[in-house]
């Protein structure tokens, strides 16, 4: 893989900014910028920046190359699971829609052209292990998102079967809230809720088996889905990245502990040592923490997709 670029914020004159999230910038692509022969419909340019967030706060320091690594992991999984579920990618060359004067090398590995879909307003979460907010729910109620689980399970223990635990989609700066399946049905309807649940568990099981063969445990993951004008369901946004998933090295996994993960845990652990109220603005992060975090993302990309950045 070529030398990584660093991008904190993307500004693309001529492409209307639709949304700037914690990590991704999303632009509308005017019809005249699309290549000749592009099918009817609306299209977006989705850019994965190197912004770093923790505790729902965007921090001032980027992780160099993080956006490229996230984009490459997503693209790998979109291709790997295309037989299970269609996705939002179009295959349109990013360079062909960029404004004049913009360096295409800056966006080549961190941006994709996607279909514009109607998002399903629920985060679709699959859990195969009892950790994080699921572990907290279980300790308090013996359930996770209203799903009964056996007594006596321990932290990080593998569940008898993967479970689907939806959550609300929060705005930037707010926190997602776990809901049960009945609440999702009330929000989106039974038919769509069942399609999303079935797709989520099907993809999770496939990805978990693949990752396990490579010495990685996929403990849980979060998907986003959208529908087109005909009601077809697509997986969209990011897919099975270290930001949206909890990956553990299999050789360091131990029930009863919180295993190390391929994500920004170094950053969260550092922030927990500070006298900081977990509200914006966030504190600066030491260079050593930045580099250790970057290396974790790079290792995940290498082990899962066979793509090396170092």
From Swiss-Prot:
SUPFAM superfamilies: SAICAR synthase-like (SSF56104)
Catalytic reaction(s) noted: 5-amino-1-(5-phospho-D-ribosyl)imidazole-4-carboxylate + L-aspartate + ATP = (2S)-2-[5-amino-1-(5-phospho-beta-D-ribosyl)imidazole-4-carboxamido]succinate + ADP + phosphate + 2 H(+)
Gene Ontology CC annotations of this record: cytoplasm
Ligase among keywords: yes
CDD domains: SAICAR_synt_Sc (cd01414)
Name the UniProt record assigns to this protein: Phosphoribosylaminoimidazole-succinocarboxamide synthase
InterPro entries registered for this protein in UniProt: SAICAR_synt/ADE2_N, SAICAR_synth, SAICAR_synthetase_CS
One Gene Ontology molecular-function label: ATP binding
Keyword DNA repair part of the UniProt annotation: no
Species this protein is from: Stenotrophomonas maltophilia (strain K279a)
Keywords: ATP-binding, Ligase, Nucleotide-binding, Purine biosynthesis
Family to which the UniProt record says this protein belongs: Belongs to the SAICAR synthetase family.
Annotated PROSITE patterns: SAICAR_SYNTHETASE_1, SAICAR_SYNTHETASE_2
Pathway given in the UniProt record: Purine metabolism; IMP biosynthesis via de novo pathway; 5-amino-1-(5-phospho-D-ribosyl)imidazole-4-carboxamide from 5-amino-1-(5-phospho-D-ribosyl)imidazole-4-carboxylate: step 1/2
UniProt EC number: 6.3.2.6
NCBIfam families hit by this protein: PRK13961.1, purC
Gene Ontology biological process: 'de novo' IMP biosynthetic process
């Amino acid at each position: 893989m070529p030398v990584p670029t660093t991008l904190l914020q993307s500004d693309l004159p001529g492409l209307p900014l639709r949304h700037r999230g914690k990590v991704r910038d999303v632009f509308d692509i005017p019809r005249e910028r699309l290549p000749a022969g592009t099918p009817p419909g609306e299209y977006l340019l989705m850019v994965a920046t190197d912004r770093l967030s923790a505790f729902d706060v965007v921090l001032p320091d980027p992780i160099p190359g993080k956006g490229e690594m996230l984009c490459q992991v997503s693209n790998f999984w979109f291709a790997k699971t295309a037989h299970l579920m269609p996705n939002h990618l179009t295959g349109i060359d990013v360079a062909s829609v960029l404004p004049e004067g913009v360096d295409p090398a800056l966006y080549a590995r961190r941006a994709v052209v996607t279909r514009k879909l109607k998002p399903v307003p629920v985060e679709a979460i699959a859990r195969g292990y009892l950790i994080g907010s699921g572990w907290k729910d279980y300790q308090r109620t013996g359930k996770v998102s209203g799903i009964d689980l056996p007594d006596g399970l321990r932290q990080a223990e593998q569940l008898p079967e993967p479970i689907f635990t939806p959550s609300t989609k929060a705005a930037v700066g707010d926190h997602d809230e776990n809901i049960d399946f009945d609440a999702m049905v009330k929000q989106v309807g039974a038919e769509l809720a069942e399609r999303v649940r079935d797709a989520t568990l099907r993809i999770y099981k496939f990805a978990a088996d693949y990752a396990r063969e490579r010495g990685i445990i996929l403990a849980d993951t979060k998907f986003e889905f959208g529908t087109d004008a005909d009601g077809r369901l697509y997986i969209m946004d990011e897919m099975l990245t270290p930001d949206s998933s909890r990956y553990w090295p299999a050789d360091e996994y131990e029930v009863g502990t919180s295993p190390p993960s391929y994500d920004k845990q170094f950053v969260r652990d550092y922030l927990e040592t500070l006298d900081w109220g977990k509200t914006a603005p966030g504190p600066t992060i030491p260079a050593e923490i930045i580099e250790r975090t970057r290396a974790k993302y790079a290792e995940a990309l290498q082990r899962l997709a066979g793509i090396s950045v170092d």
